[in-house]
A protein has these predicted regions:
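Polar, low-complexity export/assembly segments characteristic of proteins
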Residues: 8-11, 15-18, 22, 137-161, ...
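Short flexible/disordered coil segments
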Residues: 83-94, 147-162, 191-209, 321
């Protein structure tokens, strides 16, 4: 019966759909439905990818980051606690040594949190997730050329001391000894991210030799909005003691600066400092450094730099573009349709390169206090010894 054929066909189709749980068995049965099914399957696959993989992975990445930052906060809090405790005048020698031990231990932990990883991918190193933030061991032969930018806001006051007491022998103490009081010098400075600098380059890229004076350029905007450039004369010294000798000899010009290689400091004369601050200037220091200690941050995560360890295979890293804008290495996860989430945090945004240097200076200050205390105890002991019982010796010891 021709009239019953469509009914039987419809009935067969419905029976097939019920038994197979599928609207169509083959695309040719209904191309429109087939296309819609494929689109639905694709959308469902994407949603499953978001739900089962991307969102949990992003959440885990953020949790690792949060934990690392919380640990860093705890470490800095512990450092502050040690500093507060060390400010007491009632401390004994053993107490200061305990503080020193604690600070040295905390110093090692500071940037270790920056090496935190999720599933083997370091979370603070941008796209280089297979690399660590810090040097994992001492690398005495590794050498970088670094361009580190500073603004006038990076200028800070620092106190320098000279005239350390050197204990003499009993024979020397029996004679009249001329002693000098400890002197304090207060200067503004710009401190580099590293000490033990190999060489500083002048504005033309040429090395300024130790004991010689070169010229650096600084940049500022005048009252009319025009970009201007100024010159700063800088004399290079190998050590802080060498620079102090120059200061005592009157060789620290008010309108110039001194660069100390061992400490990585640009010490500014008073006039030079005022000029930079009043003009709200910026200055870039171009320097080479060879040899990095375990735990120091790698320059490529903070500055424009070039790994020049192998002269035939130099590796250039760009942290800032030609206009001085930071180049971000964001890792984005797709967590929904047309929705992305940046999961990583750049080390330069949360692990300031100055933190380690600050703690190093604290450690040096504690060591100096311990050394001074030991000398006082030694002098007291010497005063009670027969070898130092003479009038001249007693006067010198006092």
């Amino acid at each position: 019966d021709l009239h019953s054929f469509p009914t039987r066909r419809s009935s067969d189709l419905l029976n097939n759909q019920m038994s197979s749980q599928k609207k169509i068995s083959r695309p040719s049965e209904d191309p429109v439905v087939a296309i819609r099914a494929l689109r639905l399957r694709s959308n469902l696959s994407e949603i499953n990818q978001y739900y089962e993989k991307n969102i949990p992975d992003a959440d885990a990445w953020l949790n690792v980051t949060e934990t690392a930052l919380e640990n860093m906060k705890t470490i800095l809090s512990d450092i502050r606690t040690q500093c507060t405790y060390g400010a007491s005048d009632q401390l004994k020698a053993e107490d200061r040594k305990t503080i020193l031990t604690q600070l040295e231990s905390l110093r090692k932990q500071i940037y270790s949190e920056g090496n935190s990883d999720h599933a083997g991918r370091t979370v603070f190193t941008g796209y280089r997730t297979n690399c660590k933030l810090t040097f994992m061991e001492d690398e005495s032969n590794t050498e970088y050329n670094i361009q580190q930018k500073f603004s006038y806001e990076d200028i800070g006051e620092h106190r320098y001391y000279d005239g350390q007491v050197e204990l003499k022998t009993a024979e020397e103490m029996s004679q009249k000894v001329t002693t000098s009081d400890t002197k304090q010098y207060t200067y503004d400075r710009i401190r580099l991210a590293y000490g033990n600098i190999g060489s500083l380059k002048d504005k033309d890229g040429n090395e300024i030799a130790v004991g010689k004076t070169g010229t650096l350029s600084y940049h500022y905007t005048d009252n009319t909005g025009a970009a201007k450039t100024g010159d700063l004369n800088v004399t290079v010294y190998e050590t802080e003691d060498d620079w102090k000798k120059a200061v005592k000899a009157g060789n620290m010009p008010e309108d110039g600066a001194a660069f100390i290689k061992s400490t990585g400091e640009l010490v500014l004369g008073n006039e030079a400092s005022e000029t930079l601050k009043q003009s709200k200037a910026s200055i870039e220091l171009n320097y080479d450094k060879k040899g990095f200690n375990s735990g120091e941050v790698r320059p490529e995560y903070y500055f424009n730099c070039t790994d020049i360890t192998d002269a035939k295979n130099k590796i250039t890293y760009e942290k800032y573009d030609a206009n001085g804008n930071e180049i971000y290495q964001d890792i984005d996860y797709i967590i929904a349709v047309n929705q992305t989430l940046t999961v990583n945090t750049n080390a330069s945004d949360v692990f300031n390169a100055d933190i380690g240097r600050d703690v190093d200076e604290m450690i040096n200050a504690v060591k100096a206090a311990i050394d001074a205390n030991d000398k006082v105890d030694k002098i007291k002991d010497m005063m009670s010894q027969a070898a130092y019982s003479g009038v001249s010796a007693q006067e010198n010891l006092q």
